[in-house]
Amino acid sequence: MLALCVAGCQTAGKAATTNTLRVMTYNIHHGEGMDRKVDLQRIADLIKHEQADIVALQEVDKGVQRTAKRDCPAELAALSGMTCVFSNNYHFQGGEYGNAVLTRFPVKRWTNRHYKMLRPGEQRGLLQIVLDVHGRELVFLDTHVDFRGNDTERLLNADEIAEAIQPYRGRPMILCGDFNDTPGSRTCQKVAQEFTDTWSTAGTGEGLTIPAEKPRKRIDYIWISKGAPVEALRVWVPESEASDHRPVVGEFKLR
């Protein structure tokens, strides 16, 4: 199921006045921080502090028992003053669980693809949104791929991403998410056939994102499609323990 939550003006703030945009990807661990408290306000505060225009969220609850059956996508939309598109990947504790995108830009259309599964486990998906960015279409993709030690499922997920983007050829694409694999892995090598890892071109340092209190691995990424008229100006990892991951933020220029 897909849901659209609207709060405030879609074109408010920085997004309406500049040809640059800020993108964030953030696995929010259903809003639970390293202190084991669920606090959506601090997630929204971080988004606002980083002045993000588009945010890819993973591990988002809607009507789930562990988060008191709250409509977390709608709450995050209201707290951030943005539009939220939520995609359910599987039913959990009486509610829905999946990915979501917050955006200041108008949403033209969206769809969600459930990945094929080779083994029983958590259903994963690819949320695909076409945004109107200053009169130009931008394809924004949000995913959370398989986490298990054997990369068979992740490689299949990467193949499905390559298949899913075929209708968007010729348009700039930004792919965000938790890939549960490190740079140089077979998963990332597959994704890199179609996309450029923006940390490799505009990041400083190692870009480690998990665990949040003392990160040891980089598994969260912002990618841009090769040849896209989008330039990564800088990419960084803010310090935060509002989730078990740290977010990744990138500033981009539309050429």
Predicted region positions:
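A short beta-strand-loop structural module common to alpha/beta enzyme folds
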Residues: 56-61
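Active-site regions of metal-assisted phosphoester/phosphodiester hydrolases
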Residues: 10-54, 66, 78, 83-86, ...
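Bacterial N-terminal signal peptides
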Residues: 1-7
